[in-house]
């Protein structure tokens, strides 16, 4: 193996936010301070008070 440089820690952007439920970093919903990925949001949306998903 050669030299290895670890990826830089991000301070902003898509790589910073992660889902609080599963830890996924893609398609995180930040609105209203939810911080859930779209898949987890669909599962718990009704419990959070969103009436569309039931």
Curated annotation (Swiss-Prot):
Binds 1 zinc ion per subunit. GO terms for cellular component: cytosolic small ribosomal subunit. Zn(2+) binds at residues 19, 22, 37, 40. GO terms for molecular function: rRNA binding; structural constituent of ribosome; zinc ion binding. Keywords: Metal-binding, Ribonucleoprotein, Ribosomal protein, RNA-binding, rRNA-binding, Zinc. Its cofactor is Zn(2+). InterPro entries: Ribosomal_uS14, Ribosomal_uS14_arc, Ribosomal_uS14_CS, RIbosomal_uS14_euk_arc, Ribosomal_uS14_sf. The keyword tRNA processing does not apply. Disulfide bonds: none annotated. The keyword Membrane does not apply. Pfam families: Ribosomal_S14. Binds 16S rRNA, required for the assembly of 30S particles. NCBIfam families: PRK05766.1. Belongs to the universal ribosomal protein uS14 family. Zinc-binding uS14 subfamily. Part of the 30S ribosomal subunit. This is Small ribosomal subunit protein uS14. It comes from Saccharolobus solfataricus (strain ATCC 35092 / DSM 1617 / JCM 11322 / P2). The gene is rps14.
């Amino acid at each position: 193996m050669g030299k290895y440089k670890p990826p830089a820690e991000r301070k902003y952007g898509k790589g910073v936010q992660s889902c609080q439920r599963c830890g996924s970093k893609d398609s995180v919903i930040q609105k209203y301070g939810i911080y859930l990925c779209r898949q987890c949001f669909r599962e718990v949306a009704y419990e959070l008070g969103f009436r569309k998903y039931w």
